[in-house]
């Protein structure tokens, strides 16, 4: 959804997207991401595949990040919503990488037990590659973190979903409806909530 938002945000100049593992294996994420870009008519957007596992720092994604940091030194903002292996790889390729990046926004980490409808959830993004995470947190500048705990403060209800996405023929809205409608049934059945975080 973050990528969908950026694709539709006129204020953002999206330079590219890199795939990483975490919620699934890199090959599945890569295929899903490319299918989404194709279905949305965004195949001209540069997309690069990242490392497949912890510490796999040599990747097209890491090289792309270094190239973008060099080309847009002091201007580049990075949003990382998965494991941080690609950023760790960029730092391995260029020890001055983080000095060239304007800001980094991360989704990951927990600050207290993450309880989701009486179920304790494990942290995912930072724990996938602790070494890469340590590099980003200690070497990066202007790093903001949106933790799992922060995410639980905002529930996207079925009513809000209908209000924003039904009754429009906007291609992005149609795509989101087609790809996310099942989340409501899943969350209601598994967690007893009428929405998702």
Regions found by a protein language model. Give the residues of each.
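N-terminal acidic, glycine/proline-rich low-complexity segments
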Residues: 1-197
């Amino acid at each position: 959804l973050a990528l969908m938002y950026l694709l539709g945000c006129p204020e953002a100049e999206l330079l590219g997207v890199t795939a990483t593992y975490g919620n699934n294996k890199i090959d599945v994420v890569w295929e899903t991401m490319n299918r989404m870009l194709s279905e949305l008519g965004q195949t001209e957007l540069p997309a690069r595949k990242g490392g497949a596992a912890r510490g796999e720092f040599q990747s097209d994604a890491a090289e792309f990040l270094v190239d973008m940091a060099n080309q847009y030194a002091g201007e580049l903002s990075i949003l990382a919503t998965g494991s941080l292996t690609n950023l760790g790889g960029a730092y391995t390729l260029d020890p001055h990488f983080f000095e060239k990046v304007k800001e980094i926004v991360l989704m990951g980490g927990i600050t207290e037990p993450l309880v989701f409808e009486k179920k304790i959830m494990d942290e995912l993004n930072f724990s996938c590659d602790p070494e890469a995470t340590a590099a980003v947190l200690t070497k990066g500048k202007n790093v903001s973190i949106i933790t799992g705990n922060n995410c639980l403060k905002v529930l996207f209800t079925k009513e809000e979903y209908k209000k924003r996405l039904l009754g429009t023929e906007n291609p992005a809205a149609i795509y989101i409806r087609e790809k996310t409608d099942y989340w409501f049934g899943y969350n209601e059945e598994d967690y007893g909530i009428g929405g998702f975080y």
